[in-house]
Structure formats: C-alpha cells, structure tokens
Curated annotation (Swiss-Prot):
Description of how the protein assembles with itself and partners: Homodimer.
Pfam families linked to this entry: PseudoU_synth_1
Binding site for substrate: Y110
Phylogenetic classification of the source organism: Bacteria, Bacillati, Bacillota, Bacilli, Bacillales
E.C. designation(s): 5.4.99.12
Name of the protein in its database record: tRNA pseudouridine synthase A
An example Gene Ontology molecular-function term: RNA binding
Record gene name: truA
Keywords on record: Isomerase, tRNA processing
UniProt xrefs under PANTHER family: PSEUDOURIDYLATE SYNTHASE, TRNA PSEUDOURIDINE SYNTHASE-LIKE 1
Length: 249
C-alpha cells in the first residue's frame, strides 16, 4: 500500500464545504467517490482541515492510500479527467506511510478577496464592498493582529477548542487592480477567525473602528466587541505548510 499526498484547488460555490456531511454535496465526498471509481472500492480521503460552504481553496492538501501501480503524475491526470471542472488536482506526490495531511500541518496561509467595483465574473470569488475604504487605516489595524494572541474576540462562541491562542506570522493587505487581498499566514486559525478579522478590518476602513481598537478587542477576549463576520465566498485556503521531512519521497 502506498500513500499519496495531493494538493488540490476548488471553487467552493456549489459545495456545502469540504467535509462529508448528511445534507449537501461536499468536496471530500466528490473526491472519495472519484477515487472509489478508480479503485473499485471505497477510499478514505483525509484533508488538512475543513472549509465552509462557498469557501474556496488554492492549496488544500489531502492524503489517501492506494494499491494501484500508478505514478503520481498519472494520478493527477486520471483524477482531473474524472473530477468535475470546479475541483482540480494541482500536484501529487508519494509520501511516507506515516504522513498525515491534518496532523503534520505546521502552518497555513489564507487569503480573502474583496473588490471595489461590480464584476459579473468575480461575483462568487470575491466580495463587493460598495463603500469607500481607507487602506492606510486598514493596514494600521492589521499590524495589531501579527504575533501570538488570544483570538477569542475573533472566533465564534461555539469554537470547539478552549485554547484560542494562535500565532499570526504575516498579515498584509495587497492592492491588485480593483481588488484588495487580505493575506494571513499563521500557525493555525480558529473557526471563522479569518472572516471575523476581515469583517472587523473593513469596519476600520470605513471609520466604524479606529486601528487601535483592534488591540483593545484582542485584550477583551469577547466576540461581541469585534466586527461582523465577512461573507464566505471571498475566502481561500491558499497554502498548507509541512515540515521538510514530510515533503515527499
């Protein structure tokens, strides 16, 4: 038995998230059904983490076991032939049998896209902001999020873990034409953390909060003091990081 690690991208518009669930089509379900067709038996797919309904991925990582005598490059071609067009396999590598797509993760990068003008072709991939934003103020607020903090104010109350301390290594706002891209790289993120941080930073940009309010929100450890949760369709799981020893055979 061999273990394959695949990097996949998907448009989450028509899916109820990544993880298999009773109601609604999911990315994991489609992947497992496709691999099942290839193998003629059920194949379990493990992902680096969940993404919610309508959230996209540029670099989700999965692993699965196979007894097929097939090269990784051929696996990419076979899967992309069978998968729907909104799910693509970007890369596939054979890895050691102890590689875990979920538990070996050492960091992740997320990006959130907003646009300042109407664009029919980007309506499901970025969020329209119909009001003016002060980009300089947003960047000042963004700087307060870098570092190790308790992010209780920036996650939903039902977050499963009691430990809400996370480290953000890098955070920046990129201007790209009519779009603004929030980029966050960190050790890991809490449920809805990116969307709440972005929603709050957009409120900074429109003057509802001052940049220094971000620091006070972190200290408060209270979800009620932060801003709204930004919509899901602007969010992308961009890249997942692993130790060098887990990169592949």
């Amino acid at each position: 038995m061999r273990r394959f690690k695949c990097t996949i991208q998907y448009d989450g518009t028509d899916y109820s998230g990544y993880q298999v669930q009773p109601n609604g089509l999911t990315i994991q379900e489609v992947l497992e059904k496709t691999l099942g067709r290839m193998h003629k038996h059920p194949v379990k797919v493990i992902g680096s983490g969940r993404t919610d309904a309508r959230v996209h991925a540029q670099g989700q990582v999965i692993h699965f076991d196979t007894e097929l005598s097939i090269a990784p490059a051929s696996m990419v071609k076979a899967l992309n032939t069978l998968l729907p067009d909104d799910i693509r396999v970007r890369d596939c590598k054979e890895v050691a049998s102890d590689f875990e797509a979920r538990y070996d993760v050492v960091g992740k990068e997320y990006r959130y896209f907003v646009r300042r003008t109407e664009n029919a072709f980007r309506r499901h991939q970025s969020v329209l902001i119909p009001y003016s934003l002060d980009v300089a103020q947003i960047r000042l607020g963004l700087a307060h999020l870098v570092g190790t903090h308790d992010f209780s104010s920036f996650c939903v109350a039902k977050t499963e873990t009691d430990n809400r301390v996370r480290t953000i290594y890098e955070a920046e706002l990129i201007e790209q034409g009519e779009e603004l891209i929030f980029r966050f790289q960190g050790s890991g993120f809490l449920y809805n953390q990116i969307r709440i941080m972005v929603g709050t930073l957009l409120d900074v940009g429109r003057g509802r909060f001052a940049p220094d309010d971000i620091k006070r929100m972190l200290e408060a450890k209270d979800r009620n003091v932060a801003g709204v949760t930004a919509p899901p369709h602007g969010l992308y799981l961009w890249e997942v990081f692993y130790p060098e020893s887990k990169k592949g055979i």
